[in-house]
Amino acid sequence: MTILAPVTKSESSTDPRDPLARLENLFDPGTTVPLHARDKSGVLAASGNIDGVRTIAYCSDATVMGGAMGVDGCKHLVKAIDTAIEEESPIVGLWHSGGARLAEGVEALHAVGLVFEAMVRASGLIPQISVVLGFAAGGAAYGPALTDVVIMAPEGRVFVTGPDVVRSVTGEQVDMVSLGGPDTHTKKSGVAHIAAHDEADALHRARRLVSMMCEQGEFDQRAAELGDSDLRAMMPASAKRAYDVRPIVHEMLDNVEGESSFEELQGNYARSIVTGFGRMAGRTVGVIANNPLRLGCLNSESAEKAARFVRLCNAFGVPLVVVVDVPGYLPGVSMEWEGVVRRGAKLLHAFAEATVPRVTVVTRKIYGGAYIAMNSRALGATAVFAWPNSEVAVMGAKAAVGILHKRALAAAPDDEREALHDRLAAEHEAIAGGVDRRCRNRRRRRGNRPGEDSQHRHAALASAPSVRARHKNIPL
């Protein structure tokens, strides 16, 4: 491996697409070291530090043929990935490429394929983060998609075939932003995890993720013993009212320099479930939370989103905190046709496979198949805590009574039916639902008093052995 001397800002071009300038903006000041001589390959790779973490990065050189990927450029990419694997360093890719170089023909396609193979070899071994700063078209679209986290700057465009090809083949009229811009990939396709405000923010978010994934820290028992605010005070008084779970997630996690440590991933995609990294008592954790503001039901997209995040955390030894308030799987013909059974099974598989410590907190209710899917003890949860008065059942009491006592309700006089239904529902809940019964059956631990939540969560996570799994992180 050829390592050249560190470069200074004055040596880099003033072109905003200049790869050296972009790499310098990613790395800690004065730590950028190119891994090869600058050439016309359309790629520049370098090593450097991110918050002190040794990191490998590569950047498309959009000043040369629009960053198109040729044989030589792909060799640089493969070498950079191999170096990161050998050093067990994270790797960050800055993408601004029009795809394979047409002039190099099939050889270029073969070279791009070798890049993909190297990325898959690195999967699950080292964190791979992609930052899309411009076009990532054709073959270059699949590069970011094979990595663990994809961040898009406002100018980012990801598509396999551009608007002209789409128009000529299908007759559809579409512009580049609608086809492959950040809104499309954070809200519709789920390809991107984060939409940044600008290029500087995109690089900042990449740095933050490298720090959290590679410098995970340890639980600070002193911080845990201080407890936290009464999270239940943030819940609505009525059990029927929706609420946004994200403020509760933020409150569970640390603030770092006055800023919440929570970095949400895919926040605008499959919004009934929230996923992201944060720090809890100084330790990096992954958080998965049902969001009642968006119905809170599991569906095909949210189950798949959560499953991928569970496997990402498991691959890199990140403990999980699962915040549960879910009425079950969303029913409907469209859900069945969209593959809720197949895609929902991915979440079951991911949790059952996971070896990292993982704690579940039931805040209000958990019914039906979601009872199992949301990190149940049956799937290997380290501990499951339930707040007082939370409901745990096959289904809600009122719905269950409508089935179990259908004949009695039908036979009741009209003016008495509603009162009978309410009485039967209360009896059913006392017998079959509620946290107390689950605790007696040792499926759950009893609810905590205000301020004790964090102590129990931290203790359960800190005491459990953390075994980092060795599996690939396939983009589910």
UniProtKB/Swiss-Prot annotation:
Q: Where is the CoA carboxyltransferase C-terminal domain?
A: 226-476
Q: Which top-level enzyme class is recorded in the Swiss-Prot or TrEMBL entry?
A: ligase
| Residue ranges annotated for the CoA carboxyltransferase N-terminal domain, each copy included | 1-225
Signal peptide range in chain numbering: none
A Pfam family that this protein carries is Carboxyl_trans
InterPro entries associated with the record:
AccD/PCCB, AcCoA_carboxyl_beta, ClpP/crotonase-like_dom_sf, COA_CT_C, COA_CT_N
Keyword tags = ATP-binding, Ligase, Nucleotide-binding
Q: What is its EC number?
A: 6.4.1.3
Q: How does it assemble?
A: Probably a dodecamer composed of six biotin-containing alpha subunits and six beta subunits.
Q: Which protein, by its recorded name, is this?
A: Propionyl-CoA carboxylase beta chain
Q: Which organism is it from?
A: Rhodococcus erythropolis
